Amino acid sequence: MKRIQIIDSHTGGEPTRLVVSGFPSLGRGTMAERRDVLAREHDRYRTACILEPRGSDVMVGALLCDPVAPDAAAGVIFFNNSGYLGMCGHGTIGVVRTLHHMGRIEPGVHRIETPVGTVEATLHDDLSVSVRNVPAYRHAQGVVLDVPGYGPVKGDIAWGGNWFFLISDHGQRVAGDNVAALTAYASAVREGLERAGITGANGGEIDHIELFADDPEHDSRSFVLCPGLAYDRSPCGTGTSAKLACLAADGKLAPGVVWRQASVIGSVFHASYELADGGIVPTIRGSAHLSAEATLLIDEDDPFGWGIGS
């Protein structure tokens, strides 16, 4: 019987499952190198944690690792039901809040190593978390593609830690009771991008689709389709970072000004940025709440022990 220790949290409704122990050793390389080892040699541990019957399509996993740098608080590898994520904003907020719950950190500034670089996270006295993300930038503006059933769609391609296609003029109602229609639309857009061979820089797969709409109480409301056809319950940290990159490029948001980004279910991140060479460095602030501590049991005789569909 294999045992995996986990602590669950949610950030604005979006769950994060922190794996504390039970995964095989991945060596002492960078988080990117360890992610590659995990994907190549031990991927069934990801599926056991995230796929049914223990997980769900919406859950994001975060493997807690010893950091490379001595001044880093932790290393982390993010994954979901379809594979691995370079960075995860809501997940980082959840990880930092959980590290405090574990007694490993106190309020202050902490460095967290991820596969796409080291991010700075501030745990505030009220236990909210600000994440100073990796640099974000807009790769392409006003990209038009034809989407069967919907016609021409125009959007921007931006990097915020993952690759996004951001659409403001879409004709869809961004609301919690319209998720099925939003998912169908965003999925069709993603398929259209793949069919047209449209990518991020260096052929990076655009695996996140983000739709924006006006919000009566905040600066914007968004719907984010993540890899694997799950939608983000939170405003999406990397997606908000990509949005800030586009706003900055258009001259619509000045450095240091707070942008209030609501999610499709109404949870909110507060975001701002500072300028950097060729782009911006976003900071995302939100709150996470602890929801469970558990030991996952994997019986080798269980036909679904490593996840349904694994």
Curated annotation (Swiss-Prot):
* Leading EC class: isomerase
Q: Does the keyword Isomerase apply?
A: yes
Query: GO terms for molecular function, please?
Result: 4-hydroxyproline epimerase activity
Taxonomy, superkingdom: Bacteria
| UniProt xrefs under Gene3D superfamilies | Diaminopimelate Epimerase, Chain A, domain 1
Kindly state which keywords UniProt assigns to this record, in alphabetical order: Isomerase
* Pfam families for this protein: Pro_racemase (PF05544)
Q: What is its EC number?
A: 5.1.1.8
Annotated catalytic residues: 88 (proton acceptor), 236 (proton donor)
Q: Which family does it belong to?
A: Belongs to the proline racemase family.
Self-association and partners: Homodimer.
Q: What's this protein's name?
A: 4-hydroxyproline epimerase
Organism expressing this protein natively:
Burkholderia cenocepacia (strain HI2424)
